[in-house]
Amino acid sequence: MFKKILVANRGEIALRVIRTCKEMGIQTVAVYSNADAESLHVKFADEAVCIGPAASNESYLKISNIIAAAEITNADAIHPGYGFLSENARFSKICEEHGIKFIGASPEMIDRMGDKANAKATMKLAGVPCVPGSEGVIETFKECQLTAKKTGYPVMLKASAGGGGKGMRAVWKKEDLKDAWDSARQESKAAFGNDDMYMEKLIEEPRQIEIQIIGDSHGKACHLSERDCSIQRRHQKLTEEVPSPFMTTALRKKMGEAAVKASEFIKYEGAGTVEFLVDKHRNFYFMEMNTRIQVEHPITEQVINFDLIREQILVAAGVPILGKNYLPSMHSIECRINAEDPFNGFRPSPGKITTLHSPGGHGVRLDTHVYAGYSIPPNYDSMIAKLITTAQTREEAIHKMKRALDEFVIEGIKTTIPFHRQLMDHPEYIAGNYTTKFMEDFEIKPTN
């Protein structure tokens, strides 16, 4: 087992990893930028190393600084969390070269699944249902036109190196294809340094349902049930739940088997997520695979009583998994609390938290790194907390969430708490009748 793990991240996920390491008797090293000197992960770790100024590309994305921090503290493994370098094949490779275990996917796997067109081709070989569309990357606009005609409108252009909704364009008719092709490629080039595109049939008003998997170094994989991530704004998830209100026992079995088949086909090692689009007829199609821990992993932990971070560490240390699949025994909901103003287009709201009262009680979990007096820097992602409620039924979990949101007081900055309060009262949400298009029609109402 590892003696010391460096956590190459910040915020709540860094704190989350540190807590599990402490429970396992593993020493921890925090890294931080100048802007994060007062962050809780720095205070809770056994050691802490400043790796640069506030800008991410000079600190949390600076591979040489992170490797140097690992070497001077004699860390024998690095946990990348999510975001930043968690799906960076070069970072994974450099860790290998320095004799440091990367607690995540291999560089080859990150490359293979990170290229969306390649990932889709691989899933087809594994026998996993995929959305109809191009066979790999589209080289020219002429090929793009022919593929769209063959696939049938509407279609979706997607960046092969994409993520977070960047480089994606829905095209409803052929007259709009050229503009979409040009703008998607430009956006992809700017965001990822790569303008490769592929095309899929546009699945109208789908649900986005992901399957959590774990694979070990002995060729075995298992799934830990699903998460419904359909409520999104600009392809960014806002809230998630498990089980999905749209799920049936038969569909869960099929999707779980497909995810395990995919993982074992590629000999996947570590925690990962296979994301699917599910249409109104409950047909499901492979969307992408995330080769890291997900933001929303706590709701899975809550319903199956399982520490995913601990399992990641054990698998990285060569421990075999049990190989059994896990099914949800309860219902869990997560609301992402962001430092944003929901009444002003979700504009970021960095600044100093003057007052903070955390919710509590049975079935309430709060994953956060903020506290009263903490200043939220403008340099990073705006998520400051994850509020999770768990109960025997979905109705009870919603009631718990409403109560917890009412208890949650953050002053000094704007947050998305008012949005989540209104979401929990929305008839379509209460009915479980929502798709990825839900936010297009959602209007947040002013409060007194």
Residue ranges of each PLM-predicted region?
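ATP-binding N-terminal substructure of ATP-dependent carboxylate-amine bond-forming enzymes
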Residues: 1-126, 138-146, 396
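Short secondary-structure boundary/hinge segments and terminal tails
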Residues: 38-39, 87-88, 113, 140-142, ...
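Acidic/histidine-enriched active-site and ligand-binding environments that engage anionic O-linkages
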Residues: 146-156
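Catalytic beta/alpha-barrel core
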Residues: 134
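Methionine-biased hydrophobic packing positions in alpha-helices, especially
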Residues: 110-113, 123, 156, 168, ...
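Structural detector of well-ordered beta-strand residues that form the stable sheet scaffold
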Residues: 29, 79, 101-103, 131, ...
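A polyampholytic, Gly/Pro-enriched intrinsically disordered region
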Residues: 122-131, 152-154
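ATP-dependent carboxylate activation and anion-phosphoryl transfer catalytic cores
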Residues: 7-23, 48, 71-73, 104, ...
